[in-house]
Amino acid sequence: MSVLQVLHFPDERLRITAQPVKEVNADIQRIVDDMFDTMYEEEGIGLAATQVDIHQRIIVIDVSEERDQRLVLINPELIEKSGDTGIEEGCLSIPETRALVPRAEHVKVRALDREGKAFELEASELLAICIQHEMDHLVGKLFIDYLSPLKRQRIRQKLEKLAKQNSRT
């Protein structure tokens, strides 16, 4: 298992639409395990394969305080959503940035687990928000896309400045 490189905005690879996983096999399971290692190392609660330059429909999530409730969503489909909510979201691909994003309060998804078994899951609150955030990544959408063009431009400038500072160190 290993920690993968997380892509950072404005990297255009974050905009690539992920393709469905054709078969859940040992290679896919290794990707899932590496994604969990990466997410935990980066102190995130969710990670989409797109964020680590793997353009397949794979999401890993763990919103638990203890970091012991792993959720794998392969080829996730949103089948129901209801209610309105929103929290200040952050993203491993957009460091040091948070913004209020409107989301559905409850979702129901269908997906495959790490073993390739189909399941359905109903989620609310933080888990529902995290699922929606990560599913956006699979279609090349970032949480800042919900913001005004001016706010997005300011974030881009801030991150470009951070990248320059980091490249000097």
Swiss-Prot record:
Name of the gene encoding the protein in the UniProt record: def
Enzymatic class: hydrolase
Active site (record annotation): 134
Name of the molecule in the record: Peptide deformylase
UniProt keyword annotations, A-Z: Hydrolase, Iron, Metal-binding, Protein biosynthesis
Family indicated by similarity: Belongs to the polypeptide deformylase family.
Biological process according to GO: co-translational protein modification; translation
Taxonomic placement: Bacteria, Pseudomonadati, Pseudomonadota, Gammaproteobacteria, Enterobacterales
SUPFAM superfamilies: Peptide deformylase (SSF56420)
Chain sites annotated for binding Fe cation: 91, 133, 137
Enzyme Commission number: 3.5.1.88
GO MF annotation list: metal ion binding; peptide deformylase activity
Organism per entry: Pectobacterium atrosepticum (strain SCRI 1043 / ATCC BAA-672) (Erwinia carotovora subsp. atroseptica)
This protein's record includes keyword Metal-binding: yes
Recorded catalytic activity of this chain's protein: N-terminal N-formyl-L-methionyl-[peptide] + H2O = N-terminal L-methionyl-[peptide] + formate
